[in-house]
């Protein structure tokens, strides 16, 4: 039985969706083994993301432990918060992309990234300043030049200035290797034979590459590349491949404004965190 009509029928939304939003998918099921020290990592990621970008933040939490969820609800208080069972990172990101209007500038990040002030504004500058951009990252690693930059280089060859060589500090590659659990010396030996591709267009300079663990885009562009998966952590190289295959540019800021932390904050990483916040974070 129903009496009358819902008073919201035919009414416009009272809430206006933001034109820009930074999002993180979190997953901390426990604080044991691999996850033993990750609570601090996730908290640092979210604090630095908000500290470095004056935009709303959305967190999609995939089945995390109560301690993280209590912190999200009581202390961090993101502008948008979804608490769900673990539906998988890729499926969460697909849902996030579909939640916002197609023109929305939206950032996607894993929960173990560190951000410097200005990461958002510089990424948006490239997204708006270059044509047909699919992904812009704030964290460059030379290894990423192997990941689907054909369309970027093809476009740049005719429309921009391209420089090829070793431009990034070796310390950045050491940070990369340590953050993903690689042995540093073999990694450095490998990347010394690889080149960076620096692109300059209308006074803006960036690198050809993007990281699927952290990037900004437009919701309507990236939404078509996320698909439902029965895997908790789907390998995302296919995302890179499809964006590149459709002719979109994949770019990274010329200054390092983000960093992958890994699952442990050691003394060296703590120095990076202090630098990112402009002081030692408390």
Task: Indicate where each model-derived feature is located.
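Conserved catalytic core of nucleotide-sugar-dependent glycosyltransferases
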Residues: 116, 120-221
């Amino acid at each position: 039985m129903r009496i009358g009509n819902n008073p919201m029928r035919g009414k416009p939304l009272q809430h206006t969706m933001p034109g820009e939003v930074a999002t993180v998918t979190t997953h901390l099921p426990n604080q044991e083994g691999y996850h033993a020290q990750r609570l601090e990592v996730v908290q640092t990621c979210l604090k630095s993301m908000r500290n470095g970008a004056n935009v709303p933040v959305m967190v999609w939490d995939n089945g995390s432990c109560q301690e993280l969820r209590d912190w999200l609800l009581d202390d961090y208080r993101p502008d948008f918060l979804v608490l769900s069972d673990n539906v998988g990172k890729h499926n969460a990101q697909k849902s996030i992309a579909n939640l916002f209007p197609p023109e929305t500038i939206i950032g996607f990040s894993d929960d173990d990234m560190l951000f410097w002030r200005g990461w958002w504004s510089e990424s948006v500058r490239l997204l708006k300043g270059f044509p047909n951009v699919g992904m812009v990252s704030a964290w460059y690693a030379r290894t990423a030049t192997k990941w689907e930059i054909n369309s970027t280089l093809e476009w740049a060859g005719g429309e921009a200035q391209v420089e090829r060589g070793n431009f990034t500090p070796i310390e950045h590659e050491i940070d990369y290797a340590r953050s993903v659990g690689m042995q540093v010396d073999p990694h450095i030996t490998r990347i010394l034979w690889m080149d960076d591709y620096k692109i300059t267009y209308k006074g803006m300079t960036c690198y050809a590459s993007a990281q699927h663990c952290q990037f900004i885009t437009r919701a309507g562009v990236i939404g078509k590349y996320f698909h439902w998966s029965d895997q908790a952590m789907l390998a995302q190289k296919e995302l890179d491949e499809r964006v590149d295959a459709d002719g979109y540019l994949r770019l990274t800021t010329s200054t390092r404004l983000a960093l992958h932390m890994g699952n442990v904050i050691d003394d060296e990483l703590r120095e990076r965190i202090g630098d990112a916040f402009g002081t030692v974070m408390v």
